[in-house]
Structures are given as structure tokens and as C-alpha cells.
Amino acid sequence: MVSVGKKAPDFEMAGFYKGEFKTFRLSEYLGKWVVLCFYPGDFTFVUATEVSAVAEKYPEFQKLGVEVLSVSVDSVFVHKMWNDNELSKMVEGGIPFPMLSDGGGNVGTLYGVYDPEAGVENRGRFLIDPDGIIQGYEVLILPVGRNVSETLRQIQAFQLVRETKGAEVAPSGWKPGKKTLKPGPGLVGNVYKEWSVKEAFED
């Protein structure tokens, strides 16, 4: 079973990407941040909103040095049909990242998101750092979509912690430009002096 702070299981899957069918390995992305998104199925309702929303924000992921990989049990042929016939009408240019095929749910099982009774992946999102370590993940039931803006915010927070080697940490609701906390003996019992609850909700 996967866990934060542990190595993300490697995999190899066929995928549809920029009009071509290719093979992708997670280990090929070492040295980069990766958002690995599992979703239930092509030509479904919430999935269309999620995948297109990630595509719309893809330039922002790229600015942060992040690669995106989407995964479902659908074949690469169905991925192509979905992109060409629906998703390309929702976001200009269609999907700009690989759409991977996990037929049988083997990779989803490795990541704990495959539902063998339903035969689909649950909505799992894994944030993987350049060392291949899982920094965070979220798994939702099928009818509820994920928040892409929150994914971007969390990546920025993880990058802050990585860049400062833990000398600074990100409090609730932190965004770039907002106050961080610096762990140390002097902060014990004194967080209220450095941070107020309203800061969690300020833009």
C-alpha cells in the first residue's frame, strides 16, 4: 500500500499523447514533480470536468515544473475518441498530457485506488516529488470532483518545504507570498503570536 514519504511504485503503461500511442514509465519522470491522477472512466460526467480543468491549468503546472499523468482503465483507443470528440470541445487543443491505460487496474491496485467490484479506478491524485517520493495524495468517491486550484496550492507548499529543507513550513491555507512558519523551540506554544486563523482564508 502506498504512503506519504514513501517511494511511488513504478509502472509502465500505454498511453495516448498528442495524437500518438506511446509507452510511459513513471521512473522516466525522476527529477520532475508529477501529478498522477486516476479517474473512473472516459465519456463519464464528473471525469470530463476534472480532466478538462487540469488541462486548462496545465500551463500553470508547467511553470512549476510539474508533469501530469492521467490514468483510467480505458484503452488508448477510447482515450483518443474521448479527447477528439468531447474534451477538445471543452479545452482548446484537447488534452496536453499523457492519458494512460490501466486495463485490468493493475497499477490502480498498486496505488490502492482500483475498485475490483466496479472495475474502475476511484478518484486518486498523487503528488510525487523529483526523487519519486509521494508527498501527498487524495482519494474521493466517484460522484465528487477534485479541486485543481488546491492541487496547485499544495504543490507550491511542498516545493517551499523542499527548497527550504524544512526550515520553513506552510500553515493552513498558505499560498506564495503569504507568511510561513519557522519551526523551533521558540515557536512551541507560540504559534498564535506568529499566525492568526483568518490568514487561512485570505487570498
UniProtKB/Swiss-Prot annotation:
Pfam families: 1-cysPrx_C, AhpC-TSA. SUPFAM superfamilies: Thioredoxin-like. This is Selenocysteine-containing peroxiredoxin PrxU. InterPro entries: AhpC/TSA, Peroxiredoxin, Peroxiredoxin_AhpC-typ, Peroxiredoxin_C, Thioredoxin-like_sf, Thioredoxin_domain. The active site is at U47. It catalyses: a hydroperoxide + [thioredoxin]-dithiol = an alcohol + [thioredoxin]-disulfide + H2O. Residues 2-160 form the Thioredoxin domain. GO terms for molecular function: thioredoxin peroxidase activity. GO terms for cellular component: cytosol. Thiol-specific peroxidase that catalyzes the reduction of hydrogen peroxide and organic hydroperoxides to water and alcohols, respectively. Plays a role in cell protection against oxidative stress by detoxifying peroxides. It comes from the Bacteria. The keyword Oxidoreductase applies. GO terms for biological process: cell redox homeostasis; cellular response to stress; hydrogen peroxide catabolic process; response to oxidative stress. It comes from Peptoclostridium acidaminophilum (Eubacterium acidaminophilum). Its EC number is 1.11.1.24.
